[in-house]
A protein has these predicted regions:
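Short amphipathic beta-strand and strand-loop transition segments with alternating hydrophobic
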Residues: 114-116, 397-400
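Long, Pro/Ser/Thr-rich low-complexity/intrinsically disordered regulatory tracts in eukaryotic proteins
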Residues: 21, 27, 266-267
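N-terminal alpha-helical "arm" segments
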Residues: 2-23
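Soluble acyl-CoA-dependent acyltransferase catalytic core bearing the H(X)4D motif
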Residues: 6, 32-41, 45-52, 59-392, ...
């Protein structure tokens, strides 16, 4: 049996707890479009390598209800899911939505899948969908880049069921005993933090939602991707006193304004994930986050406020990081009802997540070994109409990055009534670009 510590990190266990408590969790979807035939030999090599990197695993639960779960080896699907019939270019987004909606499960599998859709006009679309519990955005960048360049990792995780139930009970019970001092310390810190932030917690007001109650149904959250030439993006950012990253935040603020995703004072709250992944770091989610307030009315002419706000937030994180992570050792003890309440508090706060993965390695745009003509990445999640009404609408975290001479920004949004259309979201994205004096394509 492996001597590697296969215990999942508290952050990953929290993500898994959220999935089981809420019945849904985010997935990350990467998409490549080829305007010529895809090299299936190269793509199958890429698929093989993905299962031998950070994606090649799933979770095996502890037999203890309050135990720590573990990673086990799982290579993923045996082959690429190739659509039997070609579809038109105009159906690409519908196909991507269908792929994002297919079951992905970090415990029962598959925790990821790779699919290909031939196009009537020529070429094909390739998409990779992965559980956010198994890998975060930066982790997926690493997994894809390594797979595309032929690099594999020996994670040395055991196979499913390699421990007998008796063995698992004994090992996990000992682990719980070892964790008790840390849990006690965490409880004290959490109580102190809750007392300090009590005013913020009790002052949360739910957003107004539709009074019409309809039967619940699955909602396809409209999604679009903005593509802008890198030189245009960088020149505009510099002219506004910002950076490529701060322009992404300004763009997020402007989208929030145009979609009505603002606070009572008209400001926009943006949550920015902060990567904490170290070399050879096998955590699924190796990140924290900072929050900043942006004025959507000034970002189109001056990005210095957003830039300095992010810098201040990152500086403050050095002092607040331990406080933010203090409660994580209590994760195995959190009841599902508490997870559902936390979700309600978070989603009703009208925060916009904005993730900028930076410049991708060119290899990340070569799943079959050659450059794709177009690339995008986004967050997606199974959402019901009941969920939308309960939380007052959904604004998926924006995902932005740079590759193949372009900046891309993915946007996913739907109002509480589920009536937002992709055409409306496209119009908003075009208007937000125009607010900054930029042009691009929205697809």
């Amino acid at each position: 049996m492996t001597n590697v510590d296969t215990t999942i990190d508290y952050m990953d266990q929290a993500s898994f707890l959220g999935l089981r408590a809420l019945g849904h969790a985010p997935v990350i979807q990467w998409t490549w479009i080829y305007r010529r035939d895809v090299d299936l030999v190269g793509l199958r090599r890429f698929h093989h390598n993905l299962g031998r990197g950070l994606l090649g695993r799933r979770i095996e639960r502890s037999p203890l209800p309050f135990g720590r779960h573990r990673w086990i080896t799982c290579r993923g699907p045996a082959d690429i899911a190739i659509a039997p019939e070609s579809r038109s270019n105009r159906d690409v987004q519908a196909w991507l939505d269908e792929q994002a909606a297919l079951p992905i499960d970090p415990e029962h599998g598959p925790s990821w899948r790779l699919a290909l859709q031939p196009l009537i006009e020529g070429g094909a679309v390739v998409t990779l969908v992965a559980s956010h519990t198994v890998v975060d955005g930066v982790g997926l960048v690493i997994a894809v880049t390594e797979a595309a360049t032929g690099i594999t990792r020996d994670l040395d995780y055991p196979a499913a069921g390699s421990r007998t139930k008796r063995q698992a009970l004994l090992e996990d019970s000992r682990a719980v005993v070892r964790d008790v001092p840390g849990m006690a310390k965490s409880l004290v810190s959490t109580v102190k933090m809750a007392g300090k932030n009590r005013a913020d917690i009790v002052s949360k007001k739910p957003r107004a939602t539709s009074a019409v109650v309809e039967p619940t149904r699955t909602v396809i959250v409209p999604a679009v991707t903005v593509h802008v030439d890198i030189e245009q993006w960088d020149e505009r950012a510099a002219s506004l006193g910002g950076t490529a990253n701060s322009l992404s935040l300004g763009f997020a603020a402007r989208l929030g304004y145009r979609l009505g995703w603002v606070a009572e004072d008209g400001s926009v709250t943006i949550s920015v994930p902060v990567n904490e992944r170290l070399p050879e770091d096998n955590r699924g989610n190796a990140l924290t986050a900072v929050t900043l307030i942006a004025d959507p009315h000034t970002v189109t002419t001056d990005l210095t406020g957003v830039r300095s706000g992010l810098k201040t937030a990152l500086t403050d994180l050095a002092d607040t990081r331990n406080e933010l992570l203090a409660a994580l050792p209590l994760t195995p003890l959190v009841p599902r009802s508490a997870a559902r309440r936390v979700e309600g508090l978070v989603l009703k706060s009208k925060v916009i997540g904005s993730s900028h993965v930076g410049d991708l390695d060119p290899a990340a745009n070569r799943p079959d070994g050659t450059d794709a003509d177009s690339f995008a990445a986004r967050m997606a999640e199974h959402i019901t109409s009941d969920h939308l009404r309960r939380v007052g609408g959904i604004f998926f975290p924006l995902v932005a990055g740079r590759v193949h001479g372009e900046v891309w920004v993915s946007i996913g949004f739907c109002n509480a009534d589920g009536t937002t259309t992709r055409e409306q979201l496209t119009e908003v994205a075009v208007q937000a670009l125009a607010d900054f004096g930029m042009t691009g394509t929205v697809e």
